[in-house]
Amino acid sequence: VNSATGTALAAAGAAAAAALALGGCSVDFGVHTETRSYDVREDVTAVRLTSDGGRVEIVGSDAPGIAVQERLRWSNSRNKPRPRHSVADGTLTLSSSCGHTIIGGGACEIAYRVRVPRGLALQVTTDDGAISASGLNGRLTLRTGNGPITVRHLRAPALSAHTDSGAIRVSGRAETADLRTDTGTIQAAALQAARLTAHTQDGRIHLTGRADTADLQTDSGGIDATALASRRLTARTADGTVRIALSTPPDSVRARTDSAAVRLTLPASHSYAVTLESQEGSRRISPAVHQDNRSPRTVVVTTNDGSITVDAA
């Protein structure tokens, strides 16, 4: 195992005056901070980052090598975070741990900003903190227990983004995109994907772009997929309105909601085998929608208690 080389900018002082004199450290109402920066010069093909807490920012770059900035934050000398980094078998591993905390707890976290070559594979896991990634072309796996996930300017073979509590925002391209949050909105703006999964238990789903196969699901929240191109689309909600407007004729659409309305807009250029089922709600199909029970393009919309509207565009 080869350790990556680095330099600490300064060590934290015990008083504000001492912290100001050191430059890289500060003390703010009992909270200490320290910033460390270093470069990793070994050959690296993947990065694995694990953190108990703190914001993580990953930036793709055309520059060679990896640049790491760590901002430590702690409340007393007994729980100062201890960062670690090493390179083995082409993987840079970044991790940290906290010291013993006093009764009543205390602050202990490291915020990371890591600049990497665009094509590296990345795996980021943090218990508590936001994750942002931009300008990346490698395989991405992002996990946070509490915090939003933002991915921009993506050009990746695969993206997996999971958060227990927080919003997910994604733009760019991915062969496969798996987006999941227990509590929070999922927003995919102009996303291009061969296969998309977007699941949230409590939150809305907003989607534009292209997804050849799309699986959208929310327990409590609506689904808004407008200006979308999709060949195979499944949309399910327990309690939330479904609004879908497809810009290209689909092969298959399956939409279901337990207690809300469904509004679907299809291209008028093709015919569809349409099935609408609602126990307690109206059903309306525009005359502009070409229906043909023999069509290979199938549309099935089901609600327990909600209206169904199918229009043509």
Language model feature labels by segment:
Residues 2-78, 99-115, 283-294:
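Short acidic/polar N-terminal linker immediately downstream of export determinants
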Residues 68, 90-97:
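Generic recognition of long tandem-repeat/solenoid scaffolds
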Residues 81, 88, 94, 297-300:
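Core solenoid repeat modules with strong leucine/isoleucine-rich periodicity
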Residues 82-87, 290-292:
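Short, exposed beta-strand/loop patches in secreted or surface proteins that constitute
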Residues 102-136:
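Surface-exposed, polar helix/loop patches in the mature regions of secreted/periplasmic/lumenal proteins
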Residues 123-180:
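Right-handed parallel beta-helix
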Residues 170-173, 177, 188-313:
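Short, surface-exposed interaction patches in beta-rich subdomains
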